[in-house]
């Protein structure tokens, strides 16, 4: 885990951070979700074309490559890609990256502490909704945090073959999760709304977390559909059988969830279970399916 020097924020940076605390996160997120589901024909197509141009979205790799092919903005945002647009690493001893985006941080979990960004840490226990039993499984393990920008493909995939054990919906704030705010809002990922998914794998437990953000109107999984809305005020746990007809088995590279706008994915691995690719440091671009780590 690389430690970077912490720079004192400028006046305008402090203003930008302060604005996040007074910004009406939930009403704006609800409005964004409603707008993104509207079927406005030519208006919707114009918005999609403008967005794609502004953020340099590569529509040529999508199954629907024309803005006019999408009925709603959300349909465009969670667009599926063409077959083989993201080849999955076929090494049986390799894990693959779960999402397109950039590495926010990665490295070793120091006891129970994860590096959020320059000088900011958060704990496993707070990230995992005070589930101490789950947190203990990942002490001194490894983590990688992937930030998905507006231009990125927003479906999330499995890094390895796995069986679902537990899902936890955690209500929370809806701070933006861009790299600047990750450096300036303490405990950002442990404060924001999130969906925690715990899996069993051949190398032990693994957790994949979908973290919400401002205007992330909803998060979904392939086994449960849209998790939010509705948004509850309490933590909600779902437990799953790991064998039998109702068990949820997912293959490496298989889709497991999606963001309707936003956000961030965090992966946790147990101590001495995997070895990350050396180049996966903060700021490095990621493409779903490429090599993440090898199983020890």
UniProtKB/Swiss-Prot annotation:
Cofactor(s) the protein requires to work: pyruvate
Site (Cleavage (non-hydrolytic)): 262-263
Gene: psd
GO molecular function, one term: phosphatidylserine decarboxylase activity
Species whose genome carries this gene: Actinobacillus pleuropneumoniae serotype 3 (strain JL03)
Cofactor annotation remark: Binds 1 pyruvoyl group covalently per subunit.
Protein known as: Phosphatidylserine decarboxylase proenzyme
Top EC class, one word: lyase
Family, as annotated: Belongs to the phosphatidylserine decarboxylase family. PSD-B subfamily. Prokaryotic type I sub-subfamily.
NCBIfam families on file: PS_decarb
Subcellular location field: Cell membrane
GO cellular component: plasma membrane
One BP annotation, GO: phosphatidylethanolamine biosynthetic process
Assembly with partners or alone: Heterodimer of a large membrane-associated beta subunit and a small pyruvoyl-containing alpha subunit.
EC number: 4.1.1.65
